[in-house]
Amino acid sequence: MKPIRGLFGLTAAFFLLTISSHAVAKDRVTILYDAFSDNKAVTRDWGFSALVEHDGKRILFDTGNNPEIFEHNVKALNVDLTKIDFAVISHRHTDHATGLKYLLKIKPDVTVYVPADGDNGFGGSEFPQVFYRPEPSLPVKMRYFDGTYPEHLRSGKLYATGNFILVDKLTEVAPGIFLLYTVSKIPRTLELPELTLAIKGPHGLILVDGCSHSGIEEILQAASAVDPHPYIVFGGLHLVRTPVPEIDVLVDSLKNKWKLEKVAPGHCTGEPAFLRLQKAFGDDYLYAGAGTQIEIP
């Protein structure tokens, strides 16, 4: 009987060790894709992707610009995308969405949240009957559908596989995990909706942005419906072409108006903004190049 007790004890110890290892698992963000890095194992390219791990959920946010580079970086960082719970595509631009080709190859039925956008092609767009602007005086041969219009016109999908869910409002996709829906008000991008990942954390809201086409302050305003206290922002702030005086005003606003505690900027934030954010936030500026893994409390 002694060997049995010994085996039982060993098994129990292993079981407890397994539970313990899960209990201390850290919430974290791993940057999979960006144009800057200090990690020689990854390939740099313009675009953005991050793996977000929080409260047992694994979320892929954006997929980068090139499916081959995306695949390379994912494998170089030993990330298993078949184990993600769902994916989010922030907006339709190819430097955020092209890596879907690789994701859907290895996990074809994955749930992918995308912004409701008539031009994104992810879930297929739907246009109302009034879209046709009927002109009854035309001969039948010149009229769409011989003048007998379907009630709705549904466009095709760019991807044959994947479970695409269109989001057009603030949506809670898991307990404490939200998608913010904003639309750019900048001229020539008025039609561009964007999703931001917002997670309730013990110190405030954790935000992951793709490009912030809507403007980071517009996004923070939308986020206040979830939690008025933003803790940290990851990702692109779209300041790469913004004049320096405007960057200075925004950085001051992030720190003093919005009381943002930490920043981990990347992608289209731009080097002038990197510099000014680093000066303003000091030790609360977190380097977030491709291959970086940042723990979030």
Model-identified regions with their sequence ranges:
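Bacterial N-terminal signal peptides that target proteins for export
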Residues: 1-11
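Cap/insert and terminal regions of metallo-dependent hydrolase folds
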Residues: 111, 196, 202-292
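Metallo-beta-lactamase
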Residues: 118-195, 202, 286-297
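Bacterial N-terminal signal peptides
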Residues: 9-19
